[in-house]
Amino acid sequence: MQHLNELVEKAKLAIESIQDKSLTALDEIRVEYFGKKGHFTQLMQELRNVSAEERPAMGAKINEAKQAALEFLNAKKTEWEQAELNSKLEKERVDVSLPGRKVETGGLHPVTMTINRVTKFFSELGFSVENGPEIESDYYNFDALNIPKHHPARADHDTFWFNPELLLRTQTSGVQIRTMEKMQPPIRIMAPGRVYRNDYDQTHTPMFHQIELLYVDKKANFTELKGLLHDFLRAFFEEDLQVRFRPSYFPFTEPSAEVDVMGKNGKWLEVLGCGMVHPNVLRNVGIDPNEYSGFAVGMGVERLTMLRYNVTDLRSFFENDLRFLKQFK
């Protein structure tokens, strides 16, 4: 019995002497005392040498000592596991009062934002979006739009030609022709897209974006056009702008006008061009100009974006400078 008490105390002392409450070291002691070759296991095996009369009492005493040591070990194990968990939780604790981590998300390009803004406004008025090819034929880009052969827009210094009949479109007006060929009035469409002109400076780039509108119906008139553009410009810029229509010339509209808005500096700023669809254009697509009339509008997306966000250099839209683009998120 004395031997058993000493063994229990020895086991407890070994457990207490473990440094840093190591669970690995604790498991080594468990194996040493309670494993297949452990001290208590060996004592149980030695019972075979004890007489049958003494064996039950001796076995009970060994089990009692073993249970006392094992309970002490398990208690320490539970205590140390909880301490380890508490330490881990303390290190991983989150201060919910701290601001969240900033998530770097992408954003729409300012040109895309303008396209969405324009198309949303006109779609609510019944205009649908139509698209067309960017590599266009001479007919759809010039001839069908009443642009004569000698017009300077056809020159190499203005237009990117592949051959005498194919070019990169200089305007999305070809979409209007294609739409009028396949649809009968009333027609109410908008044509956003990329266009190309051989020019590059602070206010021009070889590729830019344009949105054109076409409305064809019986009794379409310039008064409707003016009212539509007044409403659009005030909605787009979110200001009660002063708007001016100046007489101008475009081969595909007659009469034609350029539209200006009054800037904050007291100067007029050109924003778009418009006019009544020329009768020759209607005839080219098989629409009787004596029965139907229409108006068309052309606007440069980058131009509108520059005015809305006070951008001074058109080239900034194409340089992918995050310092610039982040201002529009």
UniProtKB/Swiss-Prot annotation:
GO terms for molecular function: ATP binding; magnesium ion binding; phenylalanine-tRNA ligase activity; tRNA binding. It catalyses: tRNA(Phe) + L-phenylalanine + ATP = L-phenylalanyl-tRNA(Phe) + AMP + diphosphate + H(+). Its EC number is 6.1.1.20. It is found in: Cytoplasm. Tetramer of two alpha and two beta subunits. PANTHER family: PHENYLALANINE--TRNA LIGASE, MITOCHONDRIAL (PTHR11538:SF41), PHENYLALANYL-TRNA SYNTHETASE (PTHR11538). This is Phenylalanine--tRNA ligase alpha subunit. It comes from Haemophilus influenzae (strain ATCC 51907 / DSM 11121 / KW20 / Rd).
